[in-house]
């Protein structure tokens, strides 16, 4: 099959859970390639509306009859292993009719056939690194196809069918999906402990990355962050297999050479400037990023090496990274409001996807530097734990990470695919937080309390997977109401 063509079974599909970040990206590629797409989802959303506008037939709720939304019915049904139960009526009906039920990851692998495939794997930073790579390649004129787990600010979408020879995507390890792929180049950002509800042990989780590397296309290359112990260990094991390894980071290890070295890094507000050294080049280079955080600089190095590996110009990649405007729900500014008459009374409200202790620590470190550079203010976090199993296993670690904030509000757990566990709630995390903390499961109440707690110069961050991100605009609105009511003569709205 040539790149850009759809196999017969993917020309008329029904997607269960079409509004999810991964599923919606697949839907966009199928539609762009001329396929007919129907789907179902649990609720209306901005993503669902956008897919309808592109021609998808979508219904809210789940019913066996939805397999007949398309003329002639669906020739395949696409789903996600961990998100949709086998008892879903559409899946039950598909099996009854003998319609193939395909996993999202298998469909993505089919869509990448015939392309030079670049993938990003790792516990943290996949979406941002993948997005950086996409933006860099677009700046180089490559027009890659891509599917990303978040919406790129610069293009306003999470997927695109490009005219170039490259396909860029995330390799999701949460349910072993990354073993569907045979990349030409893969970046591994880090290997932490996660998704133990699926793997059962840390060792099993680590081993899936080794299995991923063993599936590389002939002549494939691994780009790996040498600063992360888990990723560095994978690099050593991979090199022993005879697979080419390109390391990046700032951490020297005996007998290992860095292909890209982070010499220095300085955060400047919500951006950063780094000095880097590429192996074989006599002079260091400046890498400018419009996003903060040392972890973001490391992600950019991984994207840089992957792009160079397929022939992109270093100068053009660096220029492209300088224009990277971030990903939706990653350090995203939601809005601002004044809470007084003083010039420094501005309160900024951000939204961030961080949902693991390691991610929370890195994100809050960037916010702390930003606050110090802007003259002070507190960091107030509204956190939503994700999954009961993860909350139970990592409640202490969550508490320690969140304690880097000045004040914390915790809402109810986003259980997603899981049933509640007895004794596990946001309070399980709250008891391990060492700064002022309140567990308030009611969203309306938490909006009021957070708006009342904010002071001049503060930053408020809604954080986590799930619908906690919807609270940001409500908090901004509540701050503006507070400013209008409590400060005579002041509009309370600073743009």
Curated annotation (Swiss-Prot):
Pathway: Cell wall biogenesis; peptidoglycan biosynthesis. The keyword Membrane does not apply. It is found in: Cytoplasm. GO terms for molecular function: ATP binding; UDP-N-acetylmuramate-L-alanine ligase activity. One of its GO terms (cellular component) is cytoplasm. The keyword RNA-binding does not apply. It comes from the Bacteria. Gene3D superfamilies: Mur ligase, C-terminal domain, Mur-like, catalytic domain, NAD(P)-binding Rossmann-like Domain. GO terms for biological process: cell division; cell wall organization; peptidoglycan biosynthetic process; regulation of cell shape. Its main location: cytoplasm. Its EC number is 6.3.2.8. It is an enzyme of class 6 (ligase). InterPro entries: Mur-like_cat_sf (IPR036565), Mur_ligase_C (IPR004101), Mur_ligase_C_dom_sf (IPR036615), Mur_ligase_cen (IPR013221), Mur_ligase_N (IPR000713), MurCDEF_pg_biosynth (IPR050061), UDP-N-AcMur_Ala_ligase_MurC (IPR005758). Pfam families: Mur_ligase (PF01225), Mur_ligase_C (PF02875), Mur_ligase_M (PF08245). It catalyses: UDP-N-acetyl-alpha-D-muramate + L-alanine + ATP = UDP-N-acetyl-alpha-D-muramoyl-L-alanine + ADP + phosphate + H(+). ATP binds at residues 122-128. Keywords: ATP-binding, Cell cycle, Cell division, Cell shape, Cell wall biogenesis/degradation, Cytoplasm, Ligase, Nucleotide-binding, Peptidoglycan synthesis. SUPFAM superfamilies: MurCD N-terminal domain, MurD-like peptide ligases, catalytic domain, MurD-like peptide ligases, peptide-binding domain. Belongs to the MurCDEF family. Cell wall formation. This is UDP-N-acetylmuramate--L-alanine ligase.
């Amino acid at each position: 099959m040539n790149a850009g063509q759809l196999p017969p079974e993917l020309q008329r599909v029904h997607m269960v859970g079409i509004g999810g970040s991964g599923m919606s990206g697949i839907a966009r590629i199928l539609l762009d390639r001329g396929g007919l797409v129907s789907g179902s989802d649990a609720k209306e959303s901005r993503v669902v509306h956008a897919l309808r506008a592109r021609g998808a037939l979508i219904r809210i709720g789940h019913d066996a009859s939805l397999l007949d939304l398309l003329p002639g019915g669906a020739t395949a049904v696409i789903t996600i292993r961990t998100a949709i139960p086998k008892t879903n009526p559409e899946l039950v009906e598909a099996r009854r009719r003998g319609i193939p039920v395909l996993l999202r990851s298998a469909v993505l692998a089919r869509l990448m056939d015939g392309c030079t495939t670049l993938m990003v794997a790792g516990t943290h930073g996949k979406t941002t690194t993948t997005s950086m790579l996409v933006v860099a390649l677009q700046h180089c004129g490559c027009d890659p196809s891509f599917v990303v787990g978040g919406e790129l600010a610069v293009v306003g979408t999470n997927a695109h069918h490009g005219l170039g020879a490259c396909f860029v995507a995330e390799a999701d390890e949460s349910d072993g999906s990354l073993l569907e792929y045979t990349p030409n180049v893969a970046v591994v950002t880090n290997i932490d402990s996660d998704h133990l509800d699926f793997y059962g042990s840390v060792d099993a989780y680590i081993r899936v990355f080794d299995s991923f590397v063993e599936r590389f296309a002939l002549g494939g290359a691994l780009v790996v962050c040498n600063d992360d112990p888990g990723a560095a260990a994978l690099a050593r094991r991979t090199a022993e297999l005879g697979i080419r390894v390109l390391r990046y980071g700032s951490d020297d290890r005996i007998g290992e050479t860095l292909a890209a070295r982070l010499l220095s890094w300085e955060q400047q507000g919500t951006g950063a400037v780094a000095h880097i050294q590429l192996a074989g080049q006599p002079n260091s280079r400046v890498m400018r990023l419009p996003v903060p955080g040392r972890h973001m600089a490391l992600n950019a190095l991984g994207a840089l090496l992957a792009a160079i590996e397929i022939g992109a110009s270093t100068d053009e990649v660096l220029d492209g990274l300088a224009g990277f405007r971030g990903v939706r729900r990653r350090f995203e500014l939601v809005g601002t409001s004044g809470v007084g008459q003083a010039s420094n009374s501005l309160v900024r409200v951000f939204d961030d996807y961080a949902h693991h202790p390691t991610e929370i620590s890195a994100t809050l470190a960037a916010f702390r530097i930003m606050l110090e550079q802007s003259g002070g203010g507190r960091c107030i976090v509204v956190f939503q734990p994700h999954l009961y199993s993860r909350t139970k296993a990592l409640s202490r670690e969550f508490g320690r990470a969140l304690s880097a904030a000045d004040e914390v509000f915790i809402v109810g757990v986003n259980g997603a695919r899981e049933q509640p566990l007895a004794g596990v709630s946001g309070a399980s995390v709250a008891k391990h937080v060492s700064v002022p903390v309140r567990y308030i499961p009611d969203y309306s109440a938490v909006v009021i309390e957070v708006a009342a707690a904010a002071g001049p110069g503060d930053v408020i961050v809604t954080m986590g997977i799930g619908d906690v991100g919807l609270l940001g605009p409500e908090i901004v609105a509540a701050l503006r109401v507070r400013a209008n009511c409590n400060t005579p003569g002041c509009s309370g709205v600073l743009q």
